[in-house]
Design a protein with these regions (language model features):
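A contiguous pocket-lining binding segment that forms or flanks enzyme active sites
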Residues: 108-140
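Transmembrane alpha-helical segments of multi-pass membrane transport proteins and ion-pumping complexes
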Residues: 23-27, 99, 103, 122-125, ...
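Hydrophobic core of alpha-helical transmembrane segments in multi-pass integral membrane proteins
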Residues: 13-26, 142-146, 182-186
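Helix-boundary and loop/linker segments of multi-pass membrane transporters
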Residues: 4, 8, 40-46, 133
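Central hydrophobic cores of alpha-helical transmembrane segments
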Residues: 18-19, 91-95, 137-148
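Membrane-interfacial alpha-helical segments at the cytosolic side of multi-pass membrane proteins
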Residues: 65-82, 122-132, 179-192
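C-terminal transmembrane module of polytopic alpha-helical membrane proteins
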Residues: 1-10, 152-198
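N-terminal TM1-TM2 helical hairpin plus the immediately adjacent luminal interfacial "cap"
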Residues: 15-90, 96-99, 104-113, 164-171
C-alpha cells in the first residue's frame, strides 16, 4: 500500500472514530443535545464549551447520518492532504471561524447544532491543498463548492436539504466554515512555501 493510500485509509478510520463519538452523543437524545448545542444565551452566561460542542450534536439521526456520509466522503477525497495534527488545526480554525461569524454577524441566531459547517471547512482546506498541488479535479470541487455557497446565500438551503436533515439549515454555517477552512488551507500552503528551498 503506497503512502497516499495509507493516508486515505487512516483518514477514513479517523472519520469513523469521530462518527462513533457523535453517535454516542446522539444516544443521549434531547437532554444531551440541549446541554451541548451552540446556545447564545447560555454562552453569554458562561457556558463557553458550547462554542465547541455544538458542532458535534445533531437534530436527530437523519441529520447525523447525512453529515456522517459527508464526513466519510470528504475523508476519502481530501484526507491524504494533511497529517492528523494539521487536520486538528484545520478543525479548530474552522470552528473558530464559525463561532466568530455566528457571534458577531448572526446575533439573531439563538442556537445551532451540526457538523455541516465543519465539513465545509475540511473540504475547503483540502481543496486549497489540492489546487496548490495542481490537481485539476480540485478546481472542479472548488467551483462546485463556490456555486453551492452562492446559491445558498441568494436563495437559501438547497432543495430537500431541510427535509432530509429534519430541521432548518443554517446556511451561514456553511459560509463561515468554508472561510475558516480555506484560511487554514492557505496558512498551511504559505508555511510550506516559506519552508521550501530557494
Amino acid at each position: 500500500m503506497d503512502t497516499r493510500k495509507k493516508a486515505e485509509f487512516a483518514a477514513c478510520w479517523a472519520a469513523l472514530a469521530v462518527l462513533a463519538v457523535v453517535a454516542a452523543l446522539e444516544l443521549g437524545g434531547q437532554p444531551v443535545r440541549e446541554w451541548l448545542r451552540y446556545d447564545r444565551a447560555a454562552i453569554s452566561g458562561g457556558e463557553t464549551w458550547r462554542l465547541f460542542s455544538g458542532h458535534f450534536v445533531h437534530l436527530g439521526w437523519s441529520h447525523l447520518l447525512l453529515n456522517g456520509a459527508g464526513l466519510l466522503l470528504i475523508a476519502y477525497l481530501v484526507g491524504a492532504h494533511f497529517a492528523w495534527r494539521q487536520w486538528v488545526a484545520v478543525s479548530i480554525l474552522t470552528i473558530a471561524g464559525m463561532d466568530l461569524g455566528f457571534w458577531y454577524l448572526q446575533p439573531q441566531l439563538s442556537w445551532y447544532v451540526g457538523l455541516s459547517g465543519l465539513l465545509h471547512g475540511l473540504l475547503a482546506a483540502g481543496t486549497v491543498s489540492g489546487i496548490r498541488h495542481r490537481q485539476v479535479e480540485f478546481s472542479i470541487i472548488a467551483a462546485f463548492l463556490l456555486g453551492k455557497l452562492v446559491y445558498e446565500q441568494l436563495f437559501g438551503p438547497l432543495p430537500g436539504s431541510e427535509a432530509s436533515s429534519g430541521g432548518n439549515v443554517v446556511v451561514a454555517a456553511h459560509l463561515y466554515g468554508t472561510l475558516g477552512g480555506a484560511l487554514a488551507g492557505l496558512l498551511f500552503a504559505l508555511r510550506k512555501s516559506s519552508a521550501a528551498p530557494i
